[in-house]
Amino acid sequence: MSLFAQQEDVDKLQENARTFMQHGDYANATLILTRAFQLEPQNLQIAKELSLSYFLQNESQKAMDVIKPFIDNTNSADDQAYQIAGTIYRKLGQPKDAEKLYKKAIKDFPNSGGLYNDYGEMLLAAHDPESIKIWEKGIQMDPSFGSNYYNAAKYYYYKKDNLWCILYGEIFINIESFTARTAELKDILLDSYKRFFATPDLLQNVKNRNDFEIAFLTCMNKQNDVVIRGINPETLTMIRTRFILEWDKSYAAKYPFRLFNWQEQLLQAGLFPAYNQWIFGASQNLAAYQNWTGNHSSEADEFKQFKAGIIFKVPQGQYYH
């Protein structure tokens, strides 16, 4: 068989296997990928897919046997291969091996958000407080990867650090906008704003806050005359509008921040009320939100189209924690 014909065969096998995997038929996917792997035993992509297919059938040792030769050879693996291997080690009940692997992988791939996320989740499962440091490092090194924001926002929610829960939670729902995790964090965001403004003077205790945090609190502290009306989508729209105008005037040049730029962009497009309804409406009152979208259908549709045209990415160098 010519190399070209063999490549065609391998590509077709992979395509068929992916179709089976998409339908949850991992047994057939494994059967096909095994044949593809026999044809190209050095093909990392096939190895990753075969290992994952074994893993999804609860055959973790077979999954490890496939992927381990690649991670043992530093030049053969990518960050995804390390992620797969780390997940398998955890399933096999070998956390020390997993931790050793994650540390090595992060050294080799320091900008891989997925590695930090998985390592942090493993530490969290072991009740290790270092987990948040790992997620924070992931946010710093790979700022457009969503899951580190998700885990950090939930961590800060339970630790009652509402400032960072608010910021990281909203960044996350703009990176990952239409999943169950999105809905979960929308609920957390609304509750965090209520808890955040439960303190009448946000600058009362800032001894351990950095300059960026104090700037944020200073701008938010000026919105107390709106807060006394209660926290709901309408008052949050007003609070956040005034915040952005104040931030733009006083701090935007010193602290460029993608989330605030996005909010300003929506303000200028006249879509900020719809955006705030999208975040807070259903969490506050589903019936009221449905009523709002019914009465503002063109605005709601325009926001959806506008957001669909945006891939929310956070630039490097905007890390202030």
Where are these regions (language model features)?
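Alpha-helical segment of the N-proximal tetratricopeptide repeat
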Residues: E8-L39, L56-E59, T87
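Structural motif corresponding to the intra-repeat A-B loop/turn of tetratricopeptide repeats
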Residues: H23, Q57, L92, A125-A126, ...
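TPR alpha-solenoid repeat register
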Residues: I46, A81, L115, N148, ...
